[in-house]
Amino acid sequence: MKAPIPHLILLYATFTQSLKVVTKRGSADGCTDWSVDIKKYQVLVGEPVRIKCALFYGYIRTNYTLAQSAGLSLMWYKSSGPGDFEEPIAFDGSRMSKEEDSIWFRPTLLQDSGLYACVIRNSTYCMKVSISLTVGENDTGLCYNSKMKYFEKAELSKSKEISCRDIEDFLLPTREPEILWYKECRTKTWRPSIVFKRDTLLIKEVKEDDIGNYTCELKYGGFVVRRTTELTVTAPLTDKPPKLLYPMESKLTIQETQLGGSANLTCRAFFGYSGDVSPLIYWMKGEKFIEDLDENRVWESDIRILKEHLGEQEVSISLIVDSVEEGDLGNYSCYVENGNGRRHASVLLHKRELMYTVELAGGLGAILLLLVCSVTIYKCYKIEIMLFYRNHFGAEELDGDNKDYDAYLSYTKVDPDQWNQETGEEERFALEILPDMLEKHYGYKLFIPDRDLIPTGTYIEDVARCVDQSKRLIIVMTPNYVVRRGWSIFELETRLRNMLVTGEIKVILIECSELRGIMNYQEVEALKHTIKLLTVIKWHGPKCNKLNSKFWKRLQYEMPFKRIEPITHEQALDVSEQGPFGELQTVSAISMAAATSTALATAHPDLRSTFHNTYHSQMRQKHYYRSYEYDVPPTGTLPLTSIGNQHTYCNIPMTLINGQRPQTKSSREPNPDEAHTNSAILPLLARETSISSVIW
């Protein structure tokens, strides 16, 4: 039914008045062009879409029905882009059709992308606007195109609704839509706090792991419509001003610099989440902003984001002063601001005094460290260091040049057949290893009483004279030495005691094994307090016999130093050595040989060989370091004139010199040489018979 004429005139006047209200822009050929509408359509290829003419939804106050009734027609044009040629659209009525104020695509193709212009006009008025359509494909392996996503933000611990956008054209008012939701294009078992309502997904309490892409899927006819929304989770909106991390608000920070150098003042602050507002941080000098200063040498760096999490940021900004001058010194303030307030902190740029505190501290620290290391090394390797220095740079002892021996060795002699299992190692060390190492390896000249002292009636005086001729006194404290009080001779003789008390001779006391609990050990402790120059060295058993052990190094360190080569065995057996008993030893050996020759000459022929072998065997057993054997001429006589014209004496038992045989204790067999027992040539004195020669 046609509308009455007056009504049409009124409608036309109303529509014309509506057009006159809108301001024209981009008018061409009498048609107002509103360019491209703000609403853009983005769909995936194969999905349906409805493009509405935007003129009826924001530009004019009328609808398609009223415009058509007023005699206005709606036409559609397509172009590739703004300013391109527009051509009318020929609708095929199936895939692409015009329905009232819209164009329907069922479905879209990639070539459908472009600008669609809708024009309403009559003979007097014309208005035009373009709508953008973008058709894209899914990203590889995904169910969405990352350039066609919607974006939502949610605050931590708060609720959030995610809507399935732009599906109103596909919903039926009489039916509930069947919408499926995916996260990252995969089905998910949703927790109870996530609820679905028609076309929305409600998260009652947002968590950090809710961040991601949510896709809703709706079926429309034979097509599928998908919309994807990316959810970003942030911290709750802050209600506090930013917090300064450096410099601190509560105190003035002083930064020293040198004139002519560069200075860098860095300000760091923490900003809570404030929405899309960027952090505001800057420097000021007094009441002036840095950019307002006349100096180009003073400038600010860009704001740097050091850390960021859920919208909260830690940022920094630096103030750089190139070539610091006197006028650049002073107070600089760092300000931080957000919608909740402003805070600031100050830094005082101060001239550095010419004090090398750091350098001095570093140097002293290095020296102290070097000193500690040196002391530690010296403590651990003192003996090795001193021996090395002495061997390469040391000098011999001058105060001992007039002494014949390097050391006097005092110990208790025990025959090997009397060694027991407990003290055998100590006795072997004292009798064999110690003298052998000192003489043969280190080349020292020792005075060993059992070997070098000829017994006389003045035995104690002879010992004192020999000790006085030695640079060191070595006392070997074996268990037998302690039990027999081997040191008693040093207490009986006044000269020896004074030498120990006054420090005229340095004493080296070698303790073998554990001596505590042994009889007379208390006297050993008293002896130690008596000696002024005393060094105690522990011998810890056979492991100390090794050449590289600490024991030998310590002993060598305490012994006098002299540059000599280690003596050989032949040198140690040389009877021409000079000393307090050098000549006496020569005579002793010759006299012994003469006595032995006389005894053998008068003995029975069968006993000569036996006595000769037995005598020399016993001598070898009792004397380990020097042999007193002498080859007697076959005639059995000894040219005593070879001794020389010097006055010499010896303490040989006169029975041997007279040719007498010692009395045997056995009475089972008669003595073959009994006839010679009373043939004394020289009378024996009481003093001579009282002296025994076993101390050799």
From Swiss-Prot:
It comes from the Eukaryota. This is Interleukin-1 receptor accessory protein-like 1. Pfam families: ig (PF00047), Ig_6 (PF18452), TIR (PF01582). Belongs to the interleukin-1 receptor family. Its EC number is 3.2.2.6. Gene3D superfamilies: Immunoglobulins (2.60.40.10), Toll/interleukin-1 receptor homology (TIR) domain (3.40.50.10140). It is a single-pass type I membrane protein. The TIR domain mediates NAD(+) hydrolase (NADase) activity. Self-association of TIR domains is required for NADase activity. The gene is Il1rapl1. Residues 549-644 are annotated as: Interaction with NCS1. Residues 25-134, 143-232, 242-350 form the Ig-like C2-type domain. It catalyses: NAD(+) + H2O = ADP-D-ribose + nicotinamide + H(+). The chain crosses the membrane at residues 358-378. Residues 1-24 form the signal peptide. The keyword Cell membrane applies. Residues 403-559 form the TIR domain. It comes from Rattus norvegicus (Rat). Residues 379-696 are cytoplasmic. Residues 25-357 are extracellular.
